[in-house]
From Swiss-Prot:
Protein name: ATP synthase subunit beta
SUPFAM superfamilies per record: C-terminal domain of alpha and beta subunits of F1 ATP synthase, N-terminal domain of alpha and beta subunits of F1 ATP synthase, P-loop containing nucleoside triphosphate hydrolases
Gene: atpD
Binding site for ATP: G203, G204, A205, G206, V207, G208, K209, T210
Organism, as annotated: Bartonella henselae (strain ATCC 49882 / DSM 28221 / CCUG 30454 / Houston 1) (Rochalimaea henselae)
Gene Ontology terms: cellular component: plasma membrane; proton-transporting ATP synthase complex
Catalyzed reaction equations: ATP + H2O + 4 H(+)(in) = ADP + phosphate + 5 H(+)(out)
Presence of the UniProt keyword ATP-binding in the record: yes
Location relative to the cell: Cell inner membrane
Biased composition (Polar residues): 30-44
Length: 531
């Protein structure tokens, strides 16, 4: 009984001590939001730093996969504080997730815990995980804690910023509506993207999410000319490697090996936490990438923020949640799914200073859009581009579903009357064609009325004209990539809906850019048949 009383007194003392510096922590966070803090070394490589000698020291009590329990003698570190320990000569960062009883905290490891032993010392850094920010990050690949992983040496900056930030105040946010032209016909016509908005690319495995996101980087980053940040969250390491070299080939980034180790002139920073990383890294790497994007935005830049894949962020959260002992909700996801998603998505916003335009690939498990992970993402997006397996099976790429995809920008007050009318006509024709497909499959085309036969012919041409050769797929298709201006896209589909190209064969519209190319291809095909 006496023991219980003394332990509760100790707990009360700890709580008092803990509550006192909270305002100080808040000030430090707001200070880092306003600007950035200086760090004595460009990159935190070593676990033997001066502040750690004076910091609170704990010992490891338990290791369960990616979760590590650490016991402290004195006051406990704050929630979200970064702890550091040495793991076989490497610096291991642990993030405080829970306060348990008996002066113990439960932490999530940002790297493998293989090699940790009970009784090992752990140091409280007194701050949250911070990553380097600023122009020095452009052209570099970093991991979740901001360490460079591209073998080009340390990142030459002293500016760092905590990965946990508050979303901007309502009065700071910008509400202007402007279209971001991508050069991809199906996107620009039927589900246009918003500059400074959030876009989701939904699709199952192997329907082309990553190829589409790479084409968007190629088209927008080149035309846009501003800075981009790419966060690779739990995806294939091979794709991350390919993207790095493709960015160098397309001159979005500068190869440091050809430039005396410098990446000056690069336009994109890359932050990777790939499939082989522990769940802690995959659950935080999106925040690390977003922090770099926010820093550019606060300096007055219009930033592009690409995430591949948001589902892996949710998946990592579910793994961590289970290890932390939380009771899972529907389909095994974490009970805090909506909160975790909201905390990330609300930070991706435009302010009066600058903008963040976000493009997020979202894997759809078993092609089920009602799954809680993709369904939770829908609420936060300005535009959704749904990739369909049935369209991919027809060989039409990008395999964007023109009827399931949606954008709040498709409004006559934003895009103009002509664009809106043409988009509605295209969707009406495709919807009618979809409703007739069962009749065609059972009875054949001959049983349709003349009007329906004409409509089906136009719908099939529209379907093929929605395909487009990509720059990033040139090596596989052998067709040069096409970037189509919005005016050309509207002109082409307007003519197709009006029946101006009824005399041309369907094949003329497959994998071409503008309508003029389709007309030329059609004439060539007709000439070949007649000869």
């Amino acid at each position: 009984m006496v023991k219980a009383v003394t332990s509760s007194k100790e707990t009360a003392k700890v709580e008092k001590k803990k509550s006192a510096p909270r305002s100080g922590v808040k000030k430090a966070v707001s200070k880092s939001q306003a600007g950035v803090k200086d760090s004595s070394s460009p990159v935190h490589k070593s676990s033997k730093k001066a502040p750690l000698a004076e910091a609170a020291v704990g010992v490891i009590k338990q290791v369960i996969g990616a979760v590590v329990d650490v016991q402290f003698e004195g006051p406990l570190p704050n929630i979200l504080n970064a702890l550091e320990t040495d793991n076989l000569g490497n610096r291991l960062v642990l993030e405080v997730a829970q306060h348990l009883g008996e002066n113990t905290v439960r932490t999530i490891a940002m790297d493998t815990t293989d090699g940790l032993v009970r009784g090992q010392k752990v140091f409280d850094t007194g701050t949250q995980i911070s990553v380097p920010v600023g122009e020095a990050t452009l052209g570099r690949i970093m991991n979740v804690i901001g360490e460079p992983v591209d073998n080009v040496g340390p990142i030459a900056t002293s500016k760092t910023r905590s990965i946990h930030q508050e979303a901007p105040e309502y009065v700071e946010q910008s509400t202007a509506s402007e279209i971001l032209v991508t050069g991809i016909k199906v996107v620009d016509l039927l589900a246009p993207y918003s500059k400074g908005g959030k876009v989701g690319l939904f699709g199952g495995a192997g329907v082309g999410k990553t190829v589409l996101i790479m084409e968007l980087i190629n088209n927008i980053a080149k035309a846009h000319g501003g800075y981009s940040v790419f966060a690779g969250v739990g995806e294939r390491t091979r794709e991350g490697n390919d993207l790095y070299y493709e960015m160098i080939e397309s001159r979005v980034n500068v190869n440091p090996k050809d430039n005396n180790g410098s990446t000056e002139g690069s336009k994109c920073a890359l932050v990777y936490g790939q499939m082989n990383e522990p769940p802690g890294a995959r659950a935080r790497v999106a925040l690390s990438g977003l922090t770099i994007a926010e820093s550019f935005r606060d300096e007055g830049q219009d930033v592009l923020f690409f995430v591949d894949n948001i589902f892996r962020f949710t998946q990592a959260g579910a793994e961590v949640s289970a290890l932390l002992g939380r009771i899972p909700s529907a389909v095994g996801y974490q009970p805090t799914l909506a909160t975790d998603m909201g905390a990330l998505q609300e930070r991706i916003t435009s302010t009066r200073t600058g903008s963040i335009t976000s493009v997020q690939a979202i894997y759809v498990p078993a092609d089920d859009l009602t799954d809680p992970a993709p369904a939770t993402s829908f609420a936060h997006l300005d535009a959704t581009t749904v990739l369909s397996r049935s369209i991919a099976e027809k060989g039409i790429y990008p395999a964007v579903d023109p009827l399931d995809s949606f954008s709040r920008m498709l409004d006559p007050l934003i895009v103009g009357e002509e664009h809106y009318t043409v988009a509605c006509q295209v969707q009406t024709i495709l919807q009618r064609y979809r409703s007739l497909q069962d009749i065609i499959a059972i009875l054949g085309m001959d049983e349709l009325s003349e009007d329906d036969k004409l409509l089906v012919g136009r719908a099939r041409k529209i379907e093929r004209f929605l395909s487009q050769p990509f720059h990033v797929a040139e090596a596989f298709t052998g067709s040069p990539g096409k970037l189509v201006p919005l005016e050309e896209t509207i002109k082409g589909f307007k003519g197709l809906c009006a029946g101006e190209y009824d005399n041309l064969p369907e094949a003329a519209f497959y994998m071409v850019g503008s309508i003029d190319e389709a007309v030329e291809k059609g004439k060539r095909l007709i000439a070949e048949v007649s000869s």
